[in-house]
UniProtKB/Swiss-Prot annotation:
Substrate binds at S9, K41, L73, K87. Keywords: ATP-binding, Coenzyme A biosynthesis, Cytoplasm, Magnesium, Nucleotide-binding, Nucleotidyltransferase, Transferase. The keyword DNA damage does not apply. Homohexamer. Belongs to the bacterial CoaD family. Its EC number is 2.7.7.3. NCBIfam families: coaD_prev_kdtB (TIGR01510), cyt_tran_rel (TIGR00125). It holds the Pfam family CTP_transf_like. PANTHER family: PHOSPHOPANTETHEINE ADENYLYLTRANSFERASE (PTHR21342:SF1). This is Phosphopantetheine adenylyltransferase. Coiled coil: none annotated. It is found in: Cytoplasm. The lineage of its organism: Bacteria, Bacillati, Bacillota, Clostridia, Eubacteriales. It is an enzyme of class 2 (transferase).
Amino acid sequence: MNKFIYPGSFDPVTNGHLDIIERASKICDKLTVAVLINQSKNPLFSIEERVSLLKKVVKGSTNIEIECFSGLLVDFVKEKNANVIIKGLRAVSDFEYELQMALLNKNQAPDIETLFMMSSINYSFLSSSMVKELARHGGNISGLVPECIEKEIIDKFKLK
């Protein structure tokens, strides 16, 4: 069974993330979207909220699960008996960082592969940071995030 892991902070999940999730789920038997618990970051959405948003976004998908993790990614990949890490790339700048991470992961776990997926051209400019900045200032985020969670993102800034 081919098990892939797609890690990220997903703060919040964007249509770019969803594009990678949908495409990756078509080439594996089981895709785990792994939401990183990173103590050094100050996320807008709690880990529970990010997991909940992702579950809404992939509702109805039969081979996708959402989990959170902390610590080393390769340890989580081994724990899930997965064999591939999926990383989405938007630009050359993403590649430089992700290549270093892939090589480090390969050093730590030689049997785990990293598969780079290019973002669809429609989302090559998109990041969670950009969505948050737009939402913070009342900009239009429709088309940038899954429609089913758009209101929750907008409402988050109304509470701040």
